[in-house]
Amino acid sequence: MGLWLSAGVHAVVIDQDAVFLDVDNNAYFCLPGIGEVLGLEGRVLTASSDALAEDLIAAGLAAATPNAEPALTTQPPLRTARAVLEDLAPTERRRPRMRHWRGAIAAGLASRLAEQRPFAARLPPASGLRAPVASPRLLADLDAFRSLQPWLPFDGACLFRSQLLRHYLMGLGHQVDWIFAVRTWPFAAHCWLQAGDMALDDEAERLVAYHPIMVR
């Protein structure tokens, strides 16, 4: 039986396990070993039985009609911004300027304020467009942020850190992708920023263990 993911619900199949993210309820659901009876292609679900389809609809994870949310599209992270920046000659590295300090402080305050809102309200609107390859200007502004970051009075888990950096980079005119991903056995959820195939705030080698479930 053909179904569609409900509005605000995202999913990924990892081996034989299906993981759902319900954005409105800020909750993950894992259905282990269901891969043989449940297929996923984009936002289209294929259930092998009417009973399974009805259970997914009753749980709010699936719907009998499609919605306008775009299907997940993203590149796997192949490069790490940190490594690229550290390979630059000292004369090529960017020292923070006043605009970097102002941008970072404003981003930190905005991210602290965002913590008071529900998870769904912290996310930008969904878009099928992906960020382009990291430009030299983006890398220079990221390099400046990495230099001043130890002095900022802000810290937190990956959601806060990636949101802070996203606010900072977008405030300086850059487009980035906010990747939300999961792994199983053991289950873990993680998020990071990416431009093209470059991870901006994490190590690409570490991120290959995660499977993207949502991109904003």
Labelled PLM ranges:
Residues 17, 25-112, 121-125, 172:
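Long, charge-rich, low-complexity alpha-helical segments
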Residues 186-190:
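A short, glycine/Asx- and small/polar-enriched loop/turn
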Residues 87-157, 161-170, 194-195, 199-201, ...:
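Secondary-structure boundary elements
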Residues 172-185:
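Short, well-structured beta-strand/strand-turn elements
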Residues 14, 21-22:
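Acidic/polar residues at beta-strand termini and the immediately following turn/coil
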Residues 1-16:
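Long, low-complexity, charged/polar intrinsically disordered regions in eukaryotic proteins
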Residues 23-25, 196:
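Short strand-coil-strand connectors
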